[in-house]
Amino acid sequence: MKKLFATFLLLTISSLAFAQKKTVQVEAGITYPIGLKKNGNKENHIGFYANGIYNFTNSPLSAKLRLSYDSYTVVMNEYSNSPFNGRSLVILPSVNYNFPTSSKVEFYAGVGAGVSIDNMDRGVFNNGKKCHAVCAPQLGVNIINHINISAQYNITQKDFSRLMLGIGYIF
């Protein structure tokens, strides 16, 4: 009985220690664009991302470095609102303010500024690629310290701005 109690106590303490927020974390996940214009969802596809996260100690702030590949619809007005497939590689450092509501749920809001390498129909680095500055306000929630659900609006060159919804796993 003592061994069973000691094992239970050890597992409980170790799970509590593991649940504490780590200083450095890595997140991987998928994104999906939401079109905000007419015909804005015809060429949307699932993308993926990786985040490096640094949680400042004794502070509600965290810093992220995001690398993402997105495939989404570009509606260009000069071509009678015809939808095209846009592809982007985004490098986005950001700062978030975390609102811990409980040990299981934490909301956050933040903003990032970085670079978006954009192209249409041919992949990212083929002929026609363009580099644009990107600013991205973001909202999200971390659930059970490992699941991240987020919304991010990438504000960039007129035809390439987009709303991205994401879900990821924090390691």
Locate predicted features.
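Cleavable N-terminal export/targeting peptides
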Residues: 1-25
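Residue-level preference for beta-strand/loop junctions
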Residues: 5, 44-46, 87-89, 105, ...
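Gram-negative (and chloroplast) outer-membrane scaffold detector with strong preference
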Residues: 34, 46-122, 143, 147, ...
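Solvent-exposed loop/turn segments connecting transmembrane beta-strands
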Residues: 36-44, 129-131, 153-165
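An anionic, turn-rich surface loop/hairpin at beta-sheet edges
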Residues: 124-138
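Conserved active-site loop/cleft motifs that coordinate metal ions or position small ligands
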Residues: 147-153
